[in-house]
């Protein structure tokens, strides 16, 4: 009988560097939400893939940046906390952008924690004027770290990365069933799907000023699911924008969210969205517990 092996790794880095895209690419499912806007991921998203005798557990994390408000600070703390749960730490680097102070701060903190990260130089499928300089800097200043040039979007060199990761796995019973892709509750995933559509369909800063909670999940006789969700905002004016003229905006968001849920869960969904105003919700620990940060 083949002995089971397990290994875990976390993916950290700046916002929009490709962390969520990489998780989705590796597990082969759209689990972690991805938008063109920064700071989309708010909590640790656990992905699972079982390759032959090895189970790989990976943690997508919020982007690391210079936080200002209470929510932003909680997100960054959440990202750093993931390091304690993983066997390997992957620092994903956007090769289309120059190194800045935040990147240097990340490297300094990793060094202070005695962590030798694996560098994932992402977006190499696009020509970059910074690529050679980044490689030279990392090679000279971090000779003990491995460097994998990859493209999370196209999948370039991902097989080689996975071969390295599985080669580091140790004999240990799997923590999850062979076909599991996450340990996140379906209610949480459904809320994330709606939050993604809010990012795509609302302008400017409004998506950062809200949260989504799944309040009801009911399996009906025909095996379809009735889902009630609440979009929580801090101002009445935000509620007006989300609702749109005659409710047109929230209907559009609801329709797109429902389609994504049906695609992910594999069963019909009846989705009902509501908007509630809770002033200063960002200061309420109840919401942070729900968001898992």
UniProtKB/Swiss-Prot annotation:
<keyword id="KW-0472">Membrane</keyword>
<dbReference type="InterPro" id="IPR009019">
    <property type="entry name" value="KH_sf_prok-type"/>
</dbReference>
<protein>
    <recommendedName>
        <fullName>GTPase Era</fullName>
    </recommendedName>
</protein>
<dbReference type="InterPro" id="IPR005662">
    <property type="entry name" value="GTPase_Era-like"/>
</dbReference>
<dbReference type="InterPro" id="IPR030388">
    <property type="entry name" value="G_ERA_dom"/>
</dbReference>
<keyword id="KW-0342">GTP-binding</keyword>
<dbReference type="GO" id="GO:0005886">
    <property type="term" value="C:plasma membrane"/>
</dbReference>
<dbReference type="Pfam" id="PF01926">
    <property type="entry name" value="MMR_HSR1"/>
</dbReference>
<dbReference type="GO" id="GO:0000028">
    <property type="term" value="P:ribosomal small subunit assembly"/>
</dbReference>
<feature type="region of interest" description="G1">
    <location>
        <begin position="13"/>
        <end position="20"/>
    </location>
</feature>
<dbReference type="InterPro" id="IPR005225">
    <property type="entry name" value="Small_GTP-bd"/>
</dbReference>
<keyword id="KW-0997">Cell inner membrane</keyword>
<dbReference type="GO" id="GO:0005829">
    <property type="term" value="C:cytosol"/>
</dbReference>
<keyword id="KW-0694">RNA-binding</keyword>
<dbReference type="Pfam" id="PF07650">
    <property type="entry name" value="KH_2"/>
</dbReference>
<keyword id="KW-0547">Nucleotide-binding</keyword>
<keyword id="KW-1003">Cell membrane</keyword>
<dbReference type="GO" id="GO:0005525">
    <property type="term" value="F:GTP binding"/>
</dbReference>
<feature type="region of interest" description="G5">
    <location>
        <begin position="150"/>
        <end position="152"/>
    </location>
</feature>
<keyword id="KW-0690">Ribosome biogenesis</keyword>
<comment type="subunit">
    <text>Monomer.</text>
</comment>
<keyword id="KW-0699">rRNA-binding</keyword>
<feature type="region of interest" description="G3">
    <location>
        <begin position="60"/>
        <end position="63"/>
    </location>
</feature>
<comment type="similarity">
    <text>Belongs to the TRAFAC class TrmE-Era-EngA-EngB-Septin-like GTPase superfamily. Era GTPase family.</text>
</comment>
<feature type="region of interest" description="G4">
    <location>
        <begin position="122"/>
        <end position="125"/>
    </location>
</feature>
<dbReference type="InterPro" id="IPR006073">
    <property type="entry name" value="GTP-bd"/>
</dbReference>
<feature type="binding site">
    <location>
        <begin position="122"/>
        <end position="125"/>
    </location>
    <ligand>
        <name>GTP</name>
    </ligand>
</feature>
<dbReference type="GO" id="GO:0070181">
    <property type="term" value="F:small ribosomal subunit rRNA binding"/>
</dbReference>
<dbReference type="InterPro" id="IPR027417">
    <property type="entry name" value="P-loop_NTPase"/>
</dbReference>
<dbReference type="InterPro" id="IPR015946">
    <property type="entry name" value="KH_dom-like_a/b"/>
</dbReference>
<feature type="binding site">
    <location>
        <begin position="60"/>
        <end position="64"/>
    </location>
    <ligand>
        <name>GTP</name>
    </ligand>
</feature>
<keyword id="KW-0963">Cytoplasm</keyword>
<dbReference type="InterPro" id="IPR004044">
    <property type="entry name" value="KH_dom_type_2"/>
</dbReference>
<dbReference type="GO" id="GO:0003924">
    <property type="term" value="F:GTPase activity"/>
</dbReference>
<feature type="binding site">
    <location>
        <begin position="13"/>
        <end position="20"/>
    </location>
    <ligand>
        <name>GTP</name>
    </ligand>
</feature>
<dbReference type="GO" id="GO:0043024">
    <property type="term" value="F:ribosomal small subunit binding"/>
</dbReference>
<feature type="domain" description="KH type-2">
    <location>
        <begin position="202"/>
        <end position="279"/>
    </location>
</feature>
<feature type="domain" description="Era-type G">
    <location>
        <begin position="5"/>
        <end position="174"/>
    </location>
</feature>
<feature type="region of interest" description="G2">
    <location>
        <begin position="39"/>
        <end position="43"/>
    </location>
</feature>
<comment type="function">
    <text>An essential GTPase that binds both GDP and GTP, with rapid nucleotide exchange. Plays a role in 16S rRNA processing and 30S ribosomal subunit biogenesis and possibly also in cell cycle regulation and energy metabolism.</text>
</comment>
